[in-house]
């Protein structure tokens, strides 16, 4: 290998060997020197990115000492006295910075509260939205409102004076009658007609093929009292004896009507001639009247009631109810 340029020997770290850069005074923290005099005493920028809330100068002194010692070991060219002085100055600066940066917990709480005051309107809006989004709370409030409304209405009703019906309509006697009242009045009317013997709305007339009969002289409504089948009220033993006597005379007709009352058989004997029209009403299976018992003072009376509406001029008829062979042979008109 040929001879060339001589390689410069590395410096021994002395101050005289280092060329002057044109700056006077100590080294600047923001502009460190290039030739091995970098002290690296500045704040590492990585801490600001890792924890933004912490101040860069809030590092503990022990960490600073370790970093200083580490940098000192990397810079063997600097004398130890200068590095120690710079380390002490840096410690003082860091301690003063930590005192300023570290705030008491009370101040932090006050700052948080002040920040919260600025954020209160937004939080209130979010709270309102949350309340709107929750249907159960709205339902409960709605139910409370609904419950309050009837109470208010009841209070208003209680305050209003009570009005009587007589304040609007005059007092008058009611003309309406109950069913029992109507029935009792009808019974009294029939009792009076039976006891007095009045027979109104009919007359006796001659009917072809039958002889005497009764014709209606007025209209009768269904269920209305027509006439009483008047005669002698006798028991069955007396009725049988009289019937045997009447059978001996062919000119005497049979006007005897048998019925049961209180589990006992009775008979109305209307054979004797009287002026009562009930005994002259003729027989028919499809008559417009029917018989009915009427009690007056526990004494049964046999009356005729209209089975349907009867017009003026119609003959009054009812079914005798005798279906015996002897009766049918003696009186063939009973078949009709």
Swiss-Prot record:
GO biological processes: cell division; methylation
GO cellular component, as recorded: chromosome; nucleus
Record's signal peptide: none
Spans through the membrane: none
Family statement drawn from the similarity comment of this UniProt entry: Belongs to the class V-like SAM-binding methyltransferase superfamily. Histone-lysine methyltransferase family. PR/SET subfamily.
Function, as annotated: Protein-lysine N-methyltransferase that monomethylates both histones and non-histone proteins. Specifically monomethylates 'Lys-20' of histone H4 (H4K20me1). H4K20me1 is enriched during mitosis and represents a specific tag for epigenetic transcriptional repression. Mainly functions in euchromatin regions, thereby playing a central role in the silencing of euchromatic genes. Required for cell proliferation, probably by contributing to the maintenance of proper higher-order structure of DNA during mitosis. Involved in chromosome condensation and proper cytokinesis.
InterPro entries xref list: KMT5A, KMT5A-like, KMT5A-like_SET, SET_dom, SET_dom_sf
Domain named SET: residues: 200-321
Keyword Nucleus: yes
Keyword Cell inner membrane part of the UniProt annotation: no
Listed name of the protein: N-lysine methyltransferase KMT5A
Record's catalysed reaction(s): L-lysyl(20)-[histone H4] + S-adenosyl-L-methionine = N(6)-methyl-L-lysyl(20)-[histone H4] + S-adenosyl-L-homocysteine + H(+); L-lysyl-[protein] + S-adenosyl-L-methionine = N(6)-methyl-L-lysyl-[protein] + S-adenosyl-L-homocysteine + H(+)
EC number: 2.1.1.-, 2.1.1.361
Family matches, as Pfam families: SET
Comp. bias intervals (Basic and acidic residues): 67-93
Cellular localization per UniProt: Nucleus; Chromosome
Matching SUPFAM superfamilies: SET domain (SSF82199)
Gene3D superfamilies tied to this protein: SET domain
Region (Disordered): 1-112
Record keywords: Cell cycle, Cell division, Chromatin regulator, Chromosome, Methyltransferase, Mitosis, Nucleus, Repressor, S-adenosyl-L-methionine, Transcription, Transcription regulation, Transferase
Organism (species): Xenopus tropicalis (Western clawed frog)
């Amino acid at each position: 290998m040929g001879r060339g340029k001589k390689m410069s020997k590395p410096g021994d770290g002395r101050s005289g060997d280092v060329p002057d850069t044109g700056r006077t005074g100590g080294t600047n923290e923001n502009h460190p020197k290039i030739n091995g005099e970098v002290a690296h005493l500045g704040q590492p920028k990585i801490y600001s990115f890792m924890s933004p809330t912490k101040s860069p100068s809030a590092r503990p002194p022990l960490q600073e000492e370790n970093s200083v010692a580490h940098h000192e070991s990397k810079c063997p060219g600097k004398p130890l006295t200068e590095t120690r002085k710079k380390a002490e100055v840096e410690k003082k600066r860091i301690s003063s910075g930590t005192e300023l940066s570290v705030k008491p917990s009370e101040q932090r709480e006050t700052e948080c509260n002040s920040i919260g005051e600025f954020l209160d309107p937004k939080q209130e809006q979010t709270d309102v939205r949350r309340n709107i989004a929750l249907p159960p709370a709205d339902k409960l409030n709605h139910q409370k409102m609904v419950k309050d409304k009837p109470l208010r209405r009841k209070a208003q009703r209680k305050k209003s004076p009570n009005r009587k019906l007589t304040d609007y309509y005059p007092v008058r006697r009611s003309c309406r009658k109950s069913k029992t009242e109507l029935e009792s009045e009808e019974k009294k009317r029939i009792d009076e007609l039976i006891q007095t013997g009045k027979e109104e709305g009919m007359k006796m007339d001659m009917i072809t093929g039958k002889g005497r009969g009764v014709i209606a002289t007025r209209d009768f409504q269904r269920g209305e009292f027509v006439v009483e089948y008047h005669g002698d009220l006798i028991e069955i033993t007396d009725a049988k004896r009289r019937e045997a006597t009447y059978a001996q005379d062919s000119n005497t007709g049979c006007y005897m009507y048998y019925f049961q009352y209180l589990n006992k058989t009775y008979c109305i004997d209307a054979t004797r001639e009287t002026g009562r029209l009930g005994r002259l009403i003729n027989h028919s299976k499809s008559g417009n009247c029917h018989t009915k018992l009427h009690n007056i003072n526990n004494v049964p009376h046999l009356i005729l009631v209209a089975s349907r509406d009867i017009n003026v001029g119609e003959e009054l008829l009812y079914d005798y109810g005798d279906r015996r062979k002897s009766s049918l042979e003696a009186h063939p008109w009973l078949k009709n």
